[in-house]
Amino acid sequence: MKKSLLAVAVAGAVLLSSAVQAQTTPEGYQLQQVLMMSRHNLRAPLANNGSVLAQSTPNAWPAWDVPGGQLTTKGGVLEVYMGHYTREWLVAQGLIPSGECPAPDTVYAYANSLQRTVATAQFFITGAFPGCDIPVHHQEKMGTMDPTFNPVITDDSAAFRQQAVQAMEKARSQLHLDESYKLLEQITHYQDSPSCKEKHQCSLIDAKDTFSANYQQEPGVQGPLKVGNSLVDAFTLQYYEGFPMDQVAWGGIHTDRQWKVLSKLKNGYQDSLFTSPTVARNVAAPLVKYIDKVLVADRVSAPKVTVLVGHDSNIASLLTALDFKPYQLHDQYERTPIGGQLVFQRWHDGNANRDLMKIEYVYQSARQLRNAEALTLKSPAQRVTLELKGCPVDANGFCPLDKFDNVMNTAAK
């Protein structure tokens, strides 16, 4: 079943018409280099006995067909579609040729060394370049975090730990989550959960969060924010996977507004842990340095296309570390959606003989993910232009490359 489903997805992606119109770009502009920082695609939640999920409801969790945390079959299909769409876009911009494999060393794929990230990269390459010999690079030891993608605290001083915890507490204090917790308690029947009956923890609203910023560990939190994130993450993954709606959160989510209220918990968890400047600049430093090397220091010799696959924590901390302006993603509840990509694009304006940078968030809408909609330039992924505070964009979303270089050089120090 899995193999046939994926075979259909790959074949369908290849057969979809490539005679489509490109996104309009100013006359004389030529795309020269692209770096995509992607979040892995659809995975199964962690619902082991004794986990946060099992402790938070008397209800039984639906079964998944892969172990917790691993990329699902549908996640592979979705990533094939994203790869195919990206290939169409790259061809339309003239960066790679149509109908043939890219020249050697044109495309470089690098993923964190977990199953869901490596598999995501493999499916993306299959969708973008079917039949082409393009390896996915990763650490040899699977199941361990690659330092480039590992968002851990690297400052072991007590002063930094205190600053980081205070920054996370401040970010949490700016969130208004009571309505979200109330709805979550109703959906999970939290009053009847093991947490309430056995541990006497019966109110997510009244409980307190405790943050940590320990050396060589990810920023952490214990308390209702962690519980809320775990539960809403599981509901979101069920929705994307295509579970019947009476099985998604046991049929407890009926409206778009309820999704938005619940998603405040997941987004708030990420914002609290990974988007304060103090924490983000520290945990994203290895990734910032890698991107600076590819897009700035070594750009003349770098591959035309670089594909990086990591996690939502990588994207969230990177957005803060580089000081992007606030953004809104339409048709999505997540701030850093499953399978979504930050797409850095280096362009040359031949008319004015100048180099430019454009950065977009490219992602699948919640509906596209649930319905497994094939992506083409005629039925595209969603695209939202992002702006760095240090590199103001023009009406078409482009900023001067020298200003982008300054942003990267400062962030990579």
Swiss-Prot record:
One of its GO terms (molecular function) is sugar-phosphatase activity. One of its GO terms (cellular component) is outer membrane-bounded periplasmic space. Residues 1-22 form the signal peptide. The active site is at residues 40, 312. CDD domains: HP_HAP_like. Keywords: Hydrolase, Periplasm, Signal. It catalyses: alpha-D-glucose 1-phosphate + H2O = D-glucose + phosphate. It comes from the Bacteria. It is found in: Periplasm. Pfam families: His_Phos_2. Its EC number is 3.1.3.10. The keyword ATP-binding does not apply. The keyword Disulfide bond does not apply. PANTHER family: ACID PHOSPHATASE-RELATED, GLUCOSE-1-PHOSPHATASE. Belongs to the histidine acid phosphatase family. Homodimer. This is Glucose-1-phosphatase. The gene is agp.
